[in-house]
Regions:
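Intrinsically disordered, low-complexity regions enriched in serine/threonine
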Residues: 1-54, 128-345
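Generic structural hydrophobic/aromatic packing signal, biased to beta-strands
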Residues: 69, 122-124, 144
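Beta-rich nucleic-acid/ligand-interaction surfaces
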Residues: 110-129
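Short, well-ordered loop/turn elements at secondary-structure boundaries
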Residues: 64-65, 117-118, 138
Length: 345
C-alpha cells in the first residue's frame, strides 16, 4: 500500500513514523515548502461530462455548479467542490508561521502532505515548556492543517507533546463557545491568517491554563476500579458516575476473561483495546512509571494518547497519523481528556 504521506520534512529527531526529509534548524519557509512537498498550488477547472447527441456524436457538456481541484505540478485531481468553495494553498499554511518563526521565537518542526495533496499541515514549537513531577516534560506546539477533500476545515490548534513518549494532545479545553485553544475556518469562508492568530489568542495563558489542568490530573490518584471505569467511559461512551463504576470493573474483567477463553459470536465491545490501555497504564506504557503518571488520572490520559498515536490498529502508520491528528483518534483523545478532567474535578 502506498504511503498516504506524499512528502514530509522535519527538524530534530526522526518522527515516530520514520518518514520525511530531515532539515537543519531555522530554515526559511521556501526551503520547508520544497522539502515538505508543499511547493505547488491548487488549481481549478469547471466540471464537464461527455454525452451523445441525437446523431450519436460525442459532445462535451459543462456542469457549471461544480469545479475540479487539481495539483499545479502533476495535474492530479484532488476533489470536486462547489463554486463557493474557498481553497487554501499549501504555501498559505507555511506562510502562517513566517512572522511567528522570524519574530516570535517559534520553530517549525514538521510539515507535510497527506493523501497525495488532499490534506496538508505544519506543526511549530511555540517555545513553551513545562515539567510535571518526576521530570515529565511537555512542550507546546501550534498545528495548522487543512484539506480540500471535504474531510477537514482549516484548523489551527494548540497541541501538547509529551517528550517521553511523543504523544500529542490537542489543547481545546474551553468548550465550543470559546476561541481559546482551537480555531476552525470552514471552506465557505476565506482563510485570513491574521484573523486566525487573533482568534487563537497565541498567548502564554492558554498554555499555562492547560498545564495547570495536567498538574491537577497528576495529583488525582486512581484505583484499578476507577481506571477500568474510565477506559469504559472513553471507549464505550459510558458515564463515569459512582453508581456505574462497580459494573464497569466487572465488565472489564469479563473482557479479559473473554479474550483468554474466546467464545464464538460473543465479544465485548472494545475489549482488546481496553485491555491494552489498562496494561499500558499499569506499567507497559512509555513513562507510565513516572510519578506524574503512576496510578494517576494523568497516567490514564497518557495511556489513551499513546494508544491512539502508537498502538491503535491502522492500515499504515500514515493512516494512524491522519486519525490521531484529524480523525477518530483525535476524537478519542479528546474524550479521554474530558473524562480525566471529570475524575479530577
Amino acid at each position: 500500500m502506498a504511503h498516504q504521506i506524499e512528502q514530509m520534512a522535519y527538524v530534530g529527531q526522526t518522527p515516530w513514523h520514520g518518514l520525511g526529509n530531515q532539515l537543519s534548524p531555522n530554515q526559511p519557509i521556501e526551503v520547508w515548502a520544497k522539502q515538505a512537498g508543499m511547493d505547488w498550488r491548487i488549481e481549478s477547472s469547471n466540471v464537464s461530462y461527455m454525452a451523445q447527441n441525437s446523431r450519436g456524436q460525442s459532445i462535451i457538456m459543462p456542469y457549471e455548479e461544480q469545479r475540479v481541484l487539481y495539483r499545479s505540478d502533476t495535474h492530479a485531481p484532488l476533489s470536486v467542490v462547489s463554486q463557493r468553495y474557498q481553497e487554501v494553498q499549501p504555501m498559505e499554511i507555511l506562510e502562517f508561521y513566517r512572522d511567528l518563526t522570524e519574530q516570535s521565537g517559534f520553530e517549525l518542526e514538521t510539515a507535510g502532505v497527506l493523501k497525495g495533496g488532499k490534506k496538508f499541515w505544519a506543526l511549530a514549537r511555540t517555545g513553551q515548556t513545562a515539567e510535571l513531577k518526576g521530570g515529565d516534560v511537555s512542550n507546546g506546539y501550534i498545528l495548522l492543517a487543512t484539506a480540500c477533500d471535504g474531510t477537514l476545515a482549516t484548523t489551527a490548534q494548540f497541541t501538547n507533546i509529551r517528550v517521553v513518549c511523543n504523544n500529542t494532545l490537542a489543547i481545546a479545553l474551553r468548550g465550543q463557545s470559546s476561541n481559546t485553544g482551537v480555531v476552525k475556518v470552514p471552506h465557505s469562508t476565506k482563510f485570513d491568517a491574521d484573523k486566525v492568530k487573533d482568534q487563537l489568542g497565541i498567548s502564554v495563558k492558554t498554555w499555562y491554563d492547560h498545564m495547570y489542568e495536567m498538574k491537577q490530573l497528576t495529583q488525582r490518584k486512581v484505583t484499578q476500579k476507577e481506571a477500568a471505569a474510565y477506559f469504559d467511559a472513553v471507549f464505550n461512551n459510558n458515564s463515569l458516575s459512582a453508581m456505574e463504576q462497580e459494573d464497569n470493573i466487572i465488565q472489564y474483567y469479563r473482557n479479559v476473561a473473554s479474550q483468554a477463553n474466546p467464545q464464538p459470536n460473543k465479544t465485548e465491545p472494545n475489549g482488546r483495546a481496553m485491555t491494552k490501555v489498562m496494561n499500558m497504564f499499569n506499567g507497559q506504557g512509555r513513562g507510565a512509571d513516572l510519578s506524574s503518571a503512576k496510578d494517576t488520572a494523568y497516567g490514564l490520559l497518557c495511556a489513551i494518547t499513546e494508544f491512539v498515536d502508537h498502538e491503535r490498529r491502522a492500515m499504515s502508520t500514515d493512516h494512524r497519523l491522519d486519525s490521531a491528528w484529524f480523525g477518530a483518534g483525535a476524537a478519542l483523545k479528546q474524550r479521554g481528556l474530558e473524562q480525566a478532567l471529570y475524575l479530577a474535578a
